[in-house]
């Protein structure tokens, strides 16, 4: 009876983990840096292509290791230049990765889970429930796939991916260890060399893990707020029943204090018609955030079938924004991108749609918005 050896996937190993791996097979630690550059800088998954590695070591690696990212199921490009990849992970589920170009900046929105357990009422991802956590290789693999698609070398002036946001499918803090490992690779010069200021983790408010985050990594933090009081947030973001606003904001303040350098929290606020878009909500928000240095990103709701919510009018959004501006806040309104390929914020559901169905979906969305189309007020890419 023969037994097959489970190969180590090198794609998700951080530098210390890679060095430990080479130690364990009797090789010098500097090999870790060589192999990491081939994997992350040049997108190589074939050990024979690693020409500065000896043939003997290449043969050894082929027997015990692999470089395996998620399977690309589809890649779509929006009319506005936004790209969306649907990738299949080991659990069999599909997740989505979105690239948003804007001038010299290219932001990659990365998923951390297949599905999501938090069940935010306005988010299409939450409607499908939780399926699985992604491995570190599956999280960083989304960056690897996108980078290979562009043929871009990280840490160069003309690289395609300048920013990464953990704002795709799932709650990153509920897949803590794998997300931390992937973010370290994003920032490592042997990985993707992205500045800590340009890597952002977005959370709905898992308070104990926000406190834990500061012990492990230094990245920008965004809070999915969406409501200015506990009663409303309990309805929109059910985890608020466990970690109410006072507790949540105090944890964010503690985290931001560890960063220093005058960095501020980003507040994300999805605007829902007649639910949280009134001036009195803005007034409540001003009072709520008075002790929290922050910038505010208003996100007009992106419709999806059977959501039960609508996007507010242009005037309602402007009134809300003006109220916050008058209180001294830096407020932007996010421009919807990738709507024709279901890549807009809140629309990620991990499904593969054929072109006819996607076209029908886009027409329906345009009709929903035609009566009161929102012009570009400002653009914020975190």
Curated annotation (Swiss-Prot):
[4Fe-4S] cluster binds at residues 116, 120, 123. The gene is rlmN. Reaction proceeds by a ping-pong mechanism involving intermediate methylation of a conserved cysteine residue. Its EC number is 2.1.1.192. Keywords: 4Fe-4S, Cytoplasm, Disulfide bond, Iron, Iron-sulfur, Metal-binding, Methyltransferase, rRNA processing, S-adenosyl-L-methionine, Transferase, tRNA processing. This is Dual-specificity RNA methyltransferase RlmN. Binds 1 [4Fe-4S] cluster. The cluster is coordinated with 3 cysteines and an exchangeable S-adenosyl-L-methionine. It holds the Pfam family RlmN_N. Specifically methylates position 2 of adenine 2503 in 23S rRNA and position 2 of adenine 37 in tRNAs. m2A2503 modification seems to play a crucial role in the proofreading step occurring at the peptidyl transferase center and thus would serve to optimize ribosomal fidelity.
């Amino acid at each position: 009876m023969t037994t097959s050896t489970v190969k180590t996937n090198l794609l998700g190993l951080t530098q210390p983990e890679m060095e430990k791996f080479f130690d364990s097979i009797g090789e010098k630690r500097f090999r870790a840096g060589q192999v990491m550059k081939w994997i992350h800088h040049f997108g190589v998954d074939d050990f024979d292509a690693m020409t500065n590695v000896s043939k003997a070591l290449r043969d050894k690696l082929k027997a015990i290791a692999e470089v395996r990212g998620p399977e690309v199921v589809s890649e779509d490009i929006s009319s506005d230049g936004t790209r969306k990849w649907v990738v299949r992970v080991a659990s069999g589920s599909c997740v989505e990765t979105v690239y948003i170009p804007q001038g010299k900046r290219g932001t990659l929105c990365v998923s951390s889970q297949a599905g999501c357990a938090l069940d935010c009422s306005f988010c299409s991802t939450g409607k499908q429930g939780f399926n699985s956590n992604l491995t570190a290789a599956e999280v960083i693999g989304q960056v690897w796939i996108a980078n290979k698609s562009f043929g871009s070398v990280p840490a160069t002036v003309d690289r395609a991916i300048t920013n990464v946001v953990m704002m795709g499918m799932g709650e990153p803090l509920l897949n803590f260890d794998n997300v931390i490992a992937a973010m370290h690779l994003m920032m490592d010069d042997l990985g993707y060399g992205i500045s800590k200021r340009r890597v952002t983790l977005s959370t709905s408010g898992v308070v104990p893990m926000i406190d834990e985050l500061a012990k492990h990594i230094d990245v920008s933090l965004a809070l999915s707020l969406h409501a200015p009081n506990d009663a409303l947030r309990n309805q929109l973001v059910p985890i608020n029943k466990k970690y109410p606003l006072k507790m949540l904001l105090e944890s964010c303040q503690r985290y931001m204090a560890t960063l220093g350098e005058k960095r501020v929290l980003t507040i994300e606020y999805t605007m829902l018609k007649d639910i949280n878009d009134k001036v009195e909500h803005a007034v409540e928000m001003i009072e709520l955030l008075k002790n929290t240095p922050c910038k505010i990103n208003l996100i007009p709701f992106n419709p999806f079938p059977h959501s039960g919510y609508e996007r507010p009018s242009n005037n309602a959004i402007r009134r809300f924004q003006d109220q916050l501006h008058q209180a001294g806040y830096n407020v932007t309104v996010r421009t919807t991108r990738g709507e024709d390929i279901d890549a807009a914020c809140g629309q990620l559901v991990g499904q593969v749609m054929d072109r006819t169905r996607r076209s029908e979906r886009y027409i329906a969305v345009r009709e929903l918005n035609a009566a009161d189309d929102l012009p570009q007020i400002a653009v914020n890419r975190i």
